[in-house]
């Protein structure tokens, strides 16, 4: 059996640009893509923490060190400059692979600079956020 599993995420990034008049996608700082093991053109889910919107799109590599998280095209109707977002990628793997796989978690600050890398999807670094109740990963 092949399962679709959580592969990586850029956690609580700040949207720096929103361009409605673009063909689509999300532009992401190359350093963040590399740290999260996300390739240009890869499918990502974007969860807007600010307003609850969820969408799927593909990534475009942005300038390294720029901190860019740019929402392009129709998604700019759902996600605004200044919103806090989580970019999530998934991968298909066998059950055996899934049981052994460790995801790449990239925690960023308000300027989208990396503050910590990890593998625990339930880890909460932001003040006021807690681990989900009864989560067993540590």
Curated annotation (Swiss-Prot):
Location of Pyruvic acid (Ser) modifications: 25
Query: What modifications follow translation?
Result: Is synthesized initially as an inactive proenzyme, which is activated by self-cleavage at a specific serine bond to produce a beta-subunit with a hydroxyl group at its C-terminus and an alpha-subunit with a pyruvoyl group at its N-terminus.
Q: Which InterPro entries match?
A: Asp_de-COase-like_dom_sf, Asp_decarbox
Q: Which GO terms describe its cellular component?
A: cytosol
Q: Name one GO biological process term.
A: alanine biosynthetic process
Any single Pfam family the record assigns to this protein: Asp_decarbox
Q: Where's it found, cell-wise?
A: Cytoplasm
Q: Name one GO molecular function term.
A: aspartate 1-decarboxylase activity
Active site (catalytic residues): 25 (schiff-base intermediate with substrate), 58 (proton donor)
**Keywords in alphabetical order:** Autocatalytic cleavage, Cytoplasm, Decarboxylase, Lyase, Pantothenate biosynthesis, Pyruvate, Schiff base, Zymogen
Look at the named UniProt entry and state the broad enzyme category this protein falls under. lyase
Q: Per UniProt, where does substrate bind?
A: 57, 73-75
Reactions catalysed, semicolon-separated, are: L-aspartate + H(+) = beta-alanine + CO2
Query: Which cofactor(s) are needed, names only?
Result: pyruvate
Does the record's keyword annotation contain Lyase? Answer: yes
Q: Which CDD domains match?
A: Asp_decarbox
- Cofactor note, please? Binds 1 pyruvoyl group covalently per subunit.
Coiled coil feature spans = none
Question: Would you identify the family this protein belongs to, as annotated?
Answer: Belongs to the PanD family.
**Quaternary structure, from the entry:** Heterooctamer of four alpha and four beta subunits.
Primary role: Catalyzes the pyruvoyl-dependent decarboxylation of aspartate to produce beta-alanine.
Protein name as catalogued: Aspartate 1-decarboxylase
